[in-house]
C-alpha cells in the first residue's frame, strides 16, 4: 500500500484524533514588537473589502475577493518574466504540520495561520515576524482530516480566526492580543473549525466541520464588534426528505430503493438532528443582491444510507441565503442521499456566465468531488450546465457493499476542498484534481455520540496508480480547454493573475507557474515539503510577490514542513 493509500485508509477508517499540548495565548518574540512596528499596521475598511477584486496591492480575503475568483489583477509578474522569479524570503512557523493557509496581505503586513490555530503577523517585504498568537486548546480534540486552519480575515483593526476547538476569536491586528472569544459549538460532539471567517457588513460568517461525526451543520453570522450571534441557518432542516430524487445533477441513476427508504422513514422518523451537513469553505458574497452562496458537505453517516432515508437536504448542495437575515433563498442538490462522500466542499465562485440561450447573466460555479464544474443561475440556483469530467469516472453510482465496491472518483474527488480560480477575460475556471481509486464498504453502526461515524470505510486500492491534474474549463461551454497531468493527487488550491499565469503546488514540493491560456509550464521551484495551500499575491515597495505555504497535508499524507515562501522578480 503506497503512502496515499495508507493515509486514506487511516484517516477515513479510523478518523483523526490528536492530543496536542495545551497552548496559551502569546505574543512571541516580544523584542521584535514595538509601537513603531504596530503603527505600520493599517486597518481595513468595508469599502476596501468591497473592491478587493480591483486591488493590485493587497490580498484581503481568503479567496481574493467576495466573489472568490482567486484572480489577482496585477501583472508585473507575467509570462515574459516569470522565469526570473526567485525566493524573496522564507518564514518558518513553529508548527511543522499540515499547512493550508491562504495568506492575507494588508498594506505590507501578512497574516498566516497554521495547524492548531496559530496566527502570525509578518512583514510582507522582509519576512520578519511582527507577532504570533497561539490559541489555547483543550487537551483532546477530535476532528476530521487534520488539525488544519485555512486563514483569517481582517476588518477594521481586528483579525478574525476560527479555531480547531470550535471558537471564534477576534485579535487586535497590531498586537495579536485577544479582543473577544465566542464559543461556536461543542467540539466533543464532533464540531470543529478549519475554514477562514468571511467578514462583511460588520458580520462574521462561519460554517462548521463535523459531517463525519453526526453533527447538525450550520452557517452563522456573528457581530464583528461583540462576537454575539446575529443569525443561524441550519444546513439540515427539520424536514430533510426532499423529492425522493433518483438521478444526480448530471442525469445518472443513483440506484436508490425509494420504497425501502420510505418504509425506513416510517420506522425511525427524520434523523435531522445528527445528519451532518458541514460547511468546509467560505461563502461567496453578492454585494449587489445582498445574498451569500455556499456549498454543504456530506450526510452522516457517510456510507450507510439505511439510517437516513430521504434526500437528506441540504447536504451535497449549493445554498443561497439573505446576508442580513440568514433566510433561505434557493438551493440545488447535486447528489441526493449521498452514500459515497462525494459531497460539495470547494467554495462557490461568482462569475458572469452564458445561460442556455447564450445570454450573459450573473452565475455561480462550483467544482465538485464528482470531477465536474457546475454552472448555475445566481438568481434561483438552477443548473445551467456541467463540465466534461476532469477525472476518470467508473461504476458511478455503484452502491457500497460489505465486501467493498470499486468506484471512481474516490472519496477525496475529483476536486476536494481546494478553491478554484477563474480568469474572466478568458471565461476559464482552473481546478486542481485528484485521481484515487477506492473501495467503498458499508458497515452499519449506531450513532456514537460525537465520535467518527462513517457507516463503513472508503480506502485506496493497493497497486492502483494515483495521480492529479491541473485543469482549465470554459464555464460557458463546459469544455476542457487544457489539462496538465501531475504524478500525485492535487490538493490545496490555485491562483490566476492578470499576468496570464496560474500558480499551483504539488505534494512532492513542486510549485509552478503555467501559461493560463494553454497550460505550458513556465517556471518551477522545489519547496522541500508539500505545497498544498492556496497561493496569494500582493505588491509592496513597488514589487509584486507570490506567496504560498509549504507544509504538506494530513489528508493525503504529503511531506510536512513549516515554511511560508515569498517570491519576487530579480
Language model: regions and residue ranges:
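A structural motif specific to WD40 beta-propellers
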Residues: 88, 128-132, 177-181, 230-232, ...
Amino acid at each position: 500500500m503506497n503512502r496515499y493509500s495508507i493515509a486514506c485508509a487511516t484517516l477515513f477508517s479510523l478518523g483523526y484524533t490528536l492530543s496536542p499540548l495545551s497552548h496559551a495565548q502569546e505574543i512571541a518574540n516580544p523584542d521584535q514588537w514595538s509601537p513603531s512596528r504596530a503603527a505600520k499596521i493599517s486597518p481595513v475598511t468595508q469599502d476596501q473589502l468591497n473592491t478587493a477584486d480591483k486591488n493590485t496591492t493587497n490580498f484581503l480575503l481568503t479567496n481574493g475577493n467576495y466573489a472568490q475568483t482567486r484572480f489577482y489583477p496585477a501583472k508585473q509578474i507575467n509570462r515574459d518574466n516569470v522565469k526570473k522569479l526567485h525566493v524573496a524570503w522564507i518564514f518558518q512557523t513553529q508548527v511543522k504540520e499540515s499547512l493550508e493557509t491562504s495568506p492575507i496581505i494588508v498594506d505590507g503586513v501578512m497574516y498566516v495561520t497554521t495547524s492548531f490555530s496559530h496566527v502570525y503577523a509578518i512583514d510582507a517585504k522582509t519576512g520578519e515576524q511582527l507577532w504570533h498568537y497561539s490559541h489555547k486548546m483543550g487537551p483532546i480534540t477530535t476532528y476530521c482530516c487534520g488539525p488544519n486552519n485555512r486563514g483569517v480575515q481582517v476588518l477594521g483593526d481586528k483579525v478574525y480566526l476560527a479555531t480547531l476547538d470550535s471558537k471564534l476569536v477576534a485579535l487586535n491586528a497590531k498586537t495579536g492580543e485577544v479582543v473577544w472569544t465566542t464559543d461556536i459549538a461543542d467540539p466533543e460532539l464532533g464540531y470543529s473549525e478549519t475554514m477562514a471567517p468571511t467578514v462583511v457588513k460588520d458580520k462574521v460568517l462561519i460554517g462548521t466541520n463535523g459531517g463525519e461525526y453526526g453533527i447538525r451543520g450550520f452557517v452563522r453570522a456573528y457581530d464583528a464588534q461583540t462576537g454575539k450571534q446575529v443569525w443561524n441557518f441550519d444546513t439540515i432542516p427539520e424536514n430533510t426528505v426532499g423529492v425522493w430524487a433518483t438521478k444526480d445533477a448530471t442525469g445518472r441513476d443513483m440506484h436508490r430503493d425509494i420504497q425501502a427508504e420510505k418504509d425506513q422513514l416510517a420506522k425511525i422518523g427524520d434523523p435531522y438532528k445528527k445528519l451532518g451537513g458541514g460547511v468546509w469553505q467560505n461563502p461567496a458574497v453578492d454585494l449587489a443582491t445582498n445574498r451569500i452562496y455556499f456549498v454543504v458537505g456530506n450526510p452522516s453517516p457517510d456510507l450507510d444510507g439505511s439510517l437516513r432515508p430521504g434526500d437528506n437536504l441540504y447536504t451535497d448542495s449549493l445554498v443561497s441565503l439573505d446576508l442580513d437575515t440568514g433566510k433561505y433563498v434557493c438551493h440545488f442538490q447535486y447528489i441526493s442521499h449521498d452514500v459515497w462522500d462525494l459531497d460539495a466542499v470547494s467554495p462557490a465562485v461568482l462569475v458572469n456566465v452564458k445561460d442556455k440561450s447564450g445570454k450573459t447573466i450573473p452565475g455561480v460555479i462550483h467544482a465538485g468531488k464528482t470531477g465536474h464544474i457546475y454552472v448555475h443561475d445566481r438568481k434561483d440556483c438552477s443548473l445551467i450546465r456541467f463540465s466534461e469530467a476532469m477525472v476518470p469516472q467508473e461504476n458511478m453510482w455503484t452502491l457500497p457493499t460489505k465486501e467493498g465496491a470499486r468506484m471512481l472518483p474516490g472519496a477525496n474527488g475529483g476536486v476536494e476542498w481546494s478553491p478554484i480560480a477563474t480568469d474572466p477575460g478568458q471565461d476559464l475556471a482552473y481546478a486542481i484534481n485528484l485521481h484515487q481509486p477506492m473501495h467503498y464498504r458499508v458497515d452499519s453502526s449506531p450513532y456514537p455520540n460525537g465520535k467518527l461515524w462513517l457507516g463503513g470505510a472508503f480506502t485506496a486500492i493497493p497497486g492502483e496508480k494515483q495521480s492529479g491534474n491541473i485543469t482549465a474549463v470554459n464555464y460557458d461551454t463546459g469544455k476542457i480547454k487544457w489539462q496538465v497531468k501531475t504524478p500525485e493527487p492535487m490538493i490545496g488550491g490555485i491562483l490566476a493573475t492578470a499576468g496570464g499565469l496560474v500558480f499551483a503546488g504539488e505534494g512532492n514540493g513542486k510549485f509552478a507557474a503555467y501559461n493560463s491560456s494553454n497550460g505550458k509550464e513556465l517556471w518551477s521551484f522545489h519547496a522541500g515539503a508539500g505545497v498544498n495551500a492556496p497561493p496569494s499575491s500582493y505588491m509592496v515597495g513597488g514589487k509584486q510577490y507570490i506567496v504560498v505555504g509549504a507544509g504538506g497535508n494530513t489528508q493525503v499524507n504529503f511531506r510536512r514542513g513549516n515554511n511560508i515562501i515569498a517570491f519576487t522578480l530579480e
